[in-house]
Amino acid sequence: YTSGTTGNPKGVVYHHRGAAINAVSNVLDWDINKHPVYLWTLPMFHCNGWCFPWTIAARAGVNVCLRRVDAQHIFAAIKEHGVTHYCAAPIVHNLLVNAPDELKAGVPAGVKGLIAGAAPPASIIEGMEKLGFDLTHVYGLTEVYGPASVCVKQDEWNDLNIGERARLNARQGVRYHMQQAIAV
């Protein structure tokens, strides 16, 4: 049963094959290298953590857990543990963009984040890029194991100004690589 984050709790039937396929899709669509350091800003019980418990295990990664989701703890964990990846809703990214400058100081550039859970405003994507984060927009549903489509960034976007890149990255994407294999 789901946590009911967007309404009343509901029952959803998953199968191991679907979860494994979506975990592999996470690796392929987000280009996750070996030994990632993954920061848990979303609950593992919600949609099975978007299948990232298995995704990170498949890449021999490290899981960094938080006791509280707030800007201070997130930035501290990124700096202390060398976080390379995390997933979060736009509201969490908004916390980071609007955090005091002293919390943001020393955060390494290139930390990769998935943004999902609600349509992300281009301003949040732009704000995170200005902080040095590399966000990828995905969309999913509890019924499809979490992420199901991804806004695939195009190389030519690198030549655009930051505002235009953010606008394009906020758009809906294409189906995850292996979503068709999950359909039964």
Predicted feature locations:
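Gly/Ser/Thr-rich phosphate-binding loop
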Residues: A58, V83-A88, V97-A170, V174-A183
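Conserved AMP-binding/adenylation subdomain of ANL enzymes
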Residues: A20-V37, F45-T84, A99-P100
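AMP-binding (ANL) adenylation modules
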Residues: L42-H46, G140
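Conserved AMP-binding A3 loop
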Residues: Y1-I21
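Conserved pre-ATP/AMP-binding loop-to-beta segment of ANL
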Residues: Y1, N8, D31-V37, M178
